Every structure is written in structure tokens, then in C-alpha cells.
């Protein structure tokens, strides 16, 4: 009788950790004061949901990603305000993960009038909330090497 009770208590104490809120993501650079993107701020943006296939060492893998476009995040936070589109094309941004992994993109890649790459800041994969934070995926890439797990910062340069 004691063992089942201990199991239930253990599960109840772990429940908050299993449903912990996703951490904030910092946006820095290009003359803007650093911005901490919270899940509540991102929830106010339009949601995109897309099936994305990447080549893996085990063959193609398809997942359904749900989140917000990074372009929408930058626009909503006025990160590129004051820059003409031509000036925006000279800018890049570095996406950093909690483990130190970094990938660079150009604004031209994601700008709707140019590359229009729909970089997605993902909150759920295959209908399940992510553990450990936000993920960035680049639909259209053949391989997932530019996907960033547990995004902590987007630095505009």
C-alpha cells in the first residue's frame, strides 16, 4: 500500500517540471535595447503550422512544427525599424542555443520581399509542447543542421 502512494506522490511532485513554462528568448543588437521574448508575447503573434521534412542519417524524417515566424517576431518588436529594406539586407543575425550552438542567417533570407524563408520559432512538435525551450527550424533546408534547439538568443548584427 505504501509503494503505490509513494509513486503517486513522486509523479505529483514532478508534474510542475513536466509542464514548466518555456524560457524567454533575448533579442539583441542593431541599436535596440535587449528584448526578452516571453511565451505570452509570442502567443500574441500569428501562429504558423507546417510539415517539414529533413534528411537524417536514417533517411527522411517529417515532423509537424507549430510556432511563430521569426520575421513576425522581429517586426512586432520593431527590431529593424529605421532601416530601409536595402539597409536591412546588409544585416545578419546569430541564433544561439543554450548549449552554445550557433547558426547565422541573413535578414535577406527571411525578408518577405526577398528570400522569404519561413524561419519558425517552434513551441510544439507533432502536437506536443517542447521540453527545454524554443526551437528554430528552417523549412526548405534539405538537412536540419540549421535547426537550433533550446534557443536563448537572437543577436542582430
Where are these regions (language model features)?
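Positively charged n-region of N-terminal signal peptides that target proteins for export
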Residues: 1-4
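N-terminal intrinsically disordered, low-complexity segments enriched in P/E/S/T
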Residues: 19-157
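Bacterial N-terminal signal peptides
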Residues: 6-15
